[in-house]
Amino acid sequence: MSNVRSKICGITRIEDALAAAEAGADAIGFVFYAKSPRAVDVRQARAIIAELPPFVTTVGLFVNASRCELNEILEVVPLDLLQFHGDETPQDCEGYHRPWIKALRVRPGDDLEAACQRYAGARGILLDTYVPGVPGGTGEAFDWSLVPARLGKPIILAGGLSADNVGQAIARVKPYAVDVSGGVEQAKGIKDAAKIEAFMRAVKQA
């Protein structure tokens, strides 16, 4: 049985958040990036969070958001953790009185160890697929052999994961956590409860 943590990202509906919690997800993610098909506004996020059971971590995903925009969201949405998924510098990620993680889009030749050291204040590093011009949510996996055995920070593995490949991904990378969005959807932004259950079952059995 696996102790790998899990996050269901791109939640836009209360029923999907509850399905994730019921299936045993440790965290759910809200995308505050208007260009994403999974984007939510503060009203949606607040309504969903208000219905959550205890012990489900709420994560806000941001892509090159201004400090003003981010602070306005944090004033009204009770987020536990911030996920920076753009080109933010370490300084951009600090100062919000919330723990945070930094997403890196992986491609051959990247020095992931140096990147981890650069984002020293991050609680973890999320590794996602590199697609030019797309900050995330590509639905494509990357070459897991590019991930060093030890990076010095908890690794959250993302990018093209589903019930069919997450067991293999966990065996190969040995991440602290896995992050899924498109792999548990029936349409962009609309989750499928059966796919969430299958994904969580595969994580636990890995």
UniProtKB/Swiss-Prot annotation:
GO terms for molecular function: phosphoribosylanthranilate isomerase activity. InterPro entries: Aldolase_TIM, PRAI_dom, RibuloseP-bd_barrel, TrpF_fam. It is an enzyme of class 5 (isomerase). The keyword Acyltransferase does not apply. It comes from the Bacteria. Its EC number is 5.3.1.24. It catalyses: N-(5-phospho-beta-D-ribosyl)anthranilate = 1-(2-carboxyphenylamino)-1-deoxy-D-ribulose 5-phosphate. Keywords: Amino-acid biosynthesis, Aromatic amino acid biosynthesis, Isomerase, Tryptophan biosynthesis. Belongs to the TrpF family. This is N-(5'-phosphoribosyl)anthranilate isomerase. It comes from Pseudomonas putida (strain ATCC 700007 / DSM 6899 / JCM 31910 / BCRC 17059 / LMG 24140 / F1). The lineage of its organism: Bacteria, Pseudomonadati, Pseudomonadota, Gammaproteobacteria, Pseudomonadales.
